[in-house]
Swiss-Prot record:
Residues 531-762 form the ABC transporter domain. Keywords: ATP-binding, Membrane, Nucleotide-binding, Transmembrane, Transmembrane helix, Transport. The lineage of its organism: Eukaryota, Amoebozoa, Evosea, Eumycetozoa, Dictyostelia. The chain crosses the membrane at residues 33-53, 192-212, 235-255, 292-312, 318-338, 347-367, 417-437. It comes from Dictyostelium discoideum. GO terms for molecular function: ABC-type transporter activity; ATP binding; ATP hydrolysis activity; ATPase-coupled transmembrane transporter activity; lipid transporter activity. SUPFAM superfamilies: P-loop containing nucleoside triphosphate hydrolases. PROSITE patterns: ABC_TRANSPORTER_1, ABC_TRANSPORTER_2. GO terms for cellular component: intracellular membrane-bounded organelle; membrane. It is a multi-pass membrane protein. PANTHER family: ABC TRANSPORTER A FAMILY MEMBER 7-RELATED (PTHR19229:SF272), ATP-BINDING CASSETTE TRANSPORTER SUBFAMILY A ABCA (PTHR19229). InterPro entries: AAA+_ATPase, ABC2_TM, ABC_transporter-like_ATP-bd, ABC_transporter-like_CS, ABCA, P-loop_NTPase. It is found in: Membrane. This is ABC transporter A family member 9.
Length: 845
């Protein structure tokens, strides 16, 4: 019944996309090699730099592996000329002073000094300060003005002594030692100054209480005995913090490019119209992007491991796997997210590379300047690029100094654990946001979904059953199933089709009314019908009028329906609903006996679409292109090749089946578009402007191909060429402002809406300027009107009641006396009918 095929094909969408993508990548070998070579070149540069640095500075290893003698560590014998600072805030009189000339008093007078002839002074001596604040200000000022040449004990103090308490009776001294720790301001270790200061004060107090200067106290500072192993500094890992972020993220702009390219070239739209599910599109795109990323990871990690870079061969291998796996997933979903904002590949590519370069440098500044000794705030990890770059930098730095973290170190307090966690969260969140934005953002082709589209299934569950019944459409294979259009939040601007927004109903043409009554009353043979449209309506939110308004239309087997209308009249919206791109606001349609509201999956198996412009992957061959769409339609694998070859023969492309699409001529590409529409035993084909941009010679050839196609199929043809519609169509349907205005054969419409006949008369060349046939014509028919005249050629419009045979005899009888060279008769053209029907269409006006 309905002419539907008994074959129930199961769509092989994953298989179709897998082989298409795999073949496309195989053809893009150069591009793939470049994608892999860029990170590989960066790693090779890292290897070269590593060898060069090691050759310049030699082995960066200490003499380890032996028992260190603790008593030889930080020994102090003597220091060069210098001075010490003393602070006596409590004004303890017994502290005294010690000057560079050897004079002194109190406790400090017993400090042992050494005379330096070169300076003509004794060392060490004390410079007193009244408070710690004054001393600090002085030291900071000296450091601010210090140069490399002045960094010595001659300008900066050896140490500072802060005296807190001195009790002579109890023989107790409480003091604090302050020594220089910053290496740029000192040529000796910090411990050496501490030992010197302690020795000096111990000797001083002993001499003070013993009453003489003969006592010398010496002590050393040392560690306990230990085995010191060789500490390897991995230059490659240290530098990897800058190289690896570039190497492992340079592929992201290409991910963005590939998605935007398929949107820009309408490849995704065509695939969706041919039955591809958007979820399957994203899933397979995800899989192939991750496959490319995996190949790059294998090369980068493999080369790095061969040369023993610590970041990949030491530490926790499982943690590194989790880290790289998290980055791959988050990078792909982040590229999905970014792709939703672009319509052109050029802008997408420039932005992608710019973002990678900026993010790497921004992370370097923030990680090593702002967050060097602290953890960044949580929002820092919400940008996958920054999170990955910081993690890679930290691992590279730690592994570079032989401190690669083991698995036991990955607690929540360890920042790398947080980075890995947030990368997985980023992957999920950006995927959901990308899928949402892809549906709701404005697009170049098609209409975006309502921002709350995801609530439709929930609202449908709570829809009142009585409202469901009010929209029930019985008949066909729908079996009386109810259809309910979601209202309230999502379609608050929906309208009442019956009263047409309160406007006065326009009186329908009798042919349109007859078509409508035939469909409503089921006065047709279902076996002869391939498409039945029943009250189909589409009203976009925010627009005052529906794009398609209560449309009733039928298409028979073997019929070519010329579906005409001005731009914006509703043609594309109607076809988009029939092919499943849009859902109707109300009404329905049956395609091959299947309801577009419920059975779109099966409908896609029996329909084909040839869009206005040739839409192909240029690097696929004719066979590979058709195999992709054949698999989308669900043709069994054992029949794929046979089906494709049969279609290629039907459109005369079998001899060039292995030729790449980019090598085909314009006419061949157009025929390949028809072949795409025929895949999967399509019984209904939609042709959108089939001969646009084609030469007149190729156009005639394409028309012959279309006439051959209609033998076993129904075709719905949209075109702006009235000649094309006149030649190809079995019937013409003209739509204006969303409503069907007229329907019938070409001759019927010309006779019904035409203004009569058109007659063109040419005057003999010698008499062009002296003879005008207008007076002769008006004598025959006073109602005749001159519509055009140029260079001896005159065109007249005659009323419908004109007897053409009488006019012909009249012109023959006056041919010689009025010097008439030739004349021709024509009925009102289809273009005249179209312009007359569409005269009130505001899309034209």
């Amino acid at each position: 019944m309905w002419g539907a095929s008994d074959k129930k094909y199961k769509s092989n969408q994953f298989r179709a996309m897998f082989f298409k993508n795999a073949t496309f990548i195989k053809r893009q070998k150069c591009s793939l090699c470049v994608q892999i070579s860029i990170p590989l070149i960066l790693v090779i540069i890292l290897v070269i730099v590593n060898f060069w640095v090691k050759s310049q500075i030699g082995s960066l290893q200490t003499n380890g592996g032996k028992l260190m003698n603790s008593t030889s560590t930080y020994q102090y014998n003597s220091l060069t000329f210098g001075y010490m600072l003393s602070v006596n805030e409590n004004n303890i009189t017994e502290i005294g002073y010690k000057d560079s000339d050897g004079s002194g008093s109190g406790l400090l007078n017993y400090t042992p000094q050494l005379y330096i002839p070169a300076f003509k002074a004794y060392t060490p001596f004390f410079v007193p300060f009244a408070s710690v604040e004054n001393m600090d200000d002085k030291i900071l000022a000296m450091k601010e003005n210090a140069t490399f040449e002045s960094l010595s004990s001659e300008t900066l103090p050896l140490s500072a002594l802060i005296f807190n308490d001195f009790n002579v009776n109890n023989r107790s001294l409480d003091y604090t030692i302050q020594c220089e720790e910053q290496s740029r301001y000192s040529f000796y270790p910090y411990e050496a100054f501490v030992a010197f200061s302690m020795n000096t004060m111990t000797t001083t107090i002993l001499n003070y209480f013993l009453g003489g200067n003969g006592t010398i106290y010496k002590s050393n500072i040392a560690t306990l005995p230990y085995y010191q192993q060789s500490t390897t500094i991995d230059i490659a890992s240290l530098l990897g913090g800058s190289f690896y972020p570039f190497a492992l993220s340079f592929i992201m702009p290409l991910f963005i490019y590939s998605i935007v390219y398929e949107k820009q070239e309408k490849l995704r739209d065509l695939s969706l119209m041919m039955g591809l599910k958007i979820r399957n599109y994203w899933f397979m795109t995800y899989i192939f992007n991750f496959l490319i990323y995996f190949i790059i990871i294998v090369f980068v990690v493999g080369v790095s491991s061969i040369f023993g870079f610590a970041v990949f061969v030491k530490g926790s291998q499982f943690a590194m796997f989790l880290f790289l796996f998290a980055w791959g997933n988050s990078m792909i979903t982040f590229s999905f997210f970014l792709s939703t904002f672009f319509k052109k590949t050029r802008a997408a590519s420039i932005f992608g590379y710019f973002l990678v370069i900026i993010a790497v440098n921004l992370n370097s500044i923030l990680s090593y300047q702002v967050f060097k000794d602290s953890t960044p705030p949580v929002p820092y990890y919400w940008i996958p690029l920054l999170a990955f770059y910081r993690g890679m930098s930290q691992l590279s730095t730690q592994c570079g100094i032989d401190l690669c973290p083991e698995w036991s170190a990955y607690t929540w307090e360890f920042e790398m654990s947080k980075i890995i966690f947030w990368l997985y969260i980023d992957a999920i969140v950006y995927l959901l946001i990308a899928l949402y934005l892809d549906q709701v953002l404005p697009r170049e082709f098609g209409v975006p979904s309502h921002p709350l589209f995801f609530l439709k299934p929930i609202l449908n569950l709570f829809k009142n059953k009585d409202n469901d019944k009010s929209n029930t459409i019985n008949g066909g294979s729908g079996g009386g199933r109810r259809f309910s259009e979601t209202s309230s939040l999502i379609n608050s601007a929906d309208f009442d089709v019956e009263n047409n927004n309160g406007e006065q109903e326009i009186v329908e043409d009798e042919d349109v009314l007859e078509e409508k009554e035939m469909i409503i009353n089921r006065r047709y043979d279902p076996n002869e019908m391939t498409v039945i449209i029943e009250g189909l309506t589409k009203h976009y939110v925010g627009r005052p009028k529906p794009s398609v308004d209560n449309l009733y239309l039928s298409v028979r087997k073997g019929e070519v329906l010329g579906f005409l209308g001005a731009n914006g009249a509703g043609k594309t919206t109607t076809i988009s609903m029939l092919t499943g791109l849009y859902t109707p606001t109300s009404g329905t349609a049956h395609v091959a006996g299947l309801d577009i509201r419920y059975d779109m999956d099966n409908i896609h198996h029996v329909i084909g679409v040839a869009m206005q412009f040739d839409i192909f992957w240029e690097d696929l061959s004719c066979v590979e292109t058709l195999l992709y769409f054949t698999r989308l339609k669900g043709v069994p694998p054992e029949r794929e090749i046979q089906s494709v070859e049969s279609i290629l023969k039907e459109v005369n492309l079998f001899e060039v089946k292995e030729r790449l699409v980019k090598e085909l001529s314009g006419g061949m590409k157009r025929r390949l578009s028809f072949a795409v529409a025929m895949t999967g035993d399509s019984s209904i084909i939609f042709l959108d402007e089939p001969s646009t941009g084609i030469s007149s010679e190729l156009r005639r050839d394409l028309w012959r191909t279309i006439n051959d196609l209609k033998k076993n199929r129904s075709i719905i043809l949209t075109t702006h060429s009235m000649e094309e519609a006149d030649v190809l169509s079995s019937r013409i349907a003209i739509i204006s402002q969303g409503k069907l205005q007229c329907i019938g054969t070409q001759n019927h419409l010309k006779a019904k809406f035409g203004d009569g006949y058109s007659v063109r008369i040419n005057v003999e060349e010698p008499y062009i300027n002296t003879h005008n046939p207008t007076e002769l014509i008006t004598k025959f028919s006073p109602q005749a009107v001159l519509t055009e005249s140029f260079d001896g050629s005159y065109n007249y419009r005659f009323p419908k009641n004109t007897v053409i045979s009488d006019l012909y005899q009249y012109l023959v009888s006056h041919k010689y006396d009025h010097h008439l060279q030739e004349w021709s008769f024509s009925q009102t053209s289809l273009e005249d009918v179209f312009l007359k029907i569409s005269a009130n269409d505001d899309t034209i006006n």
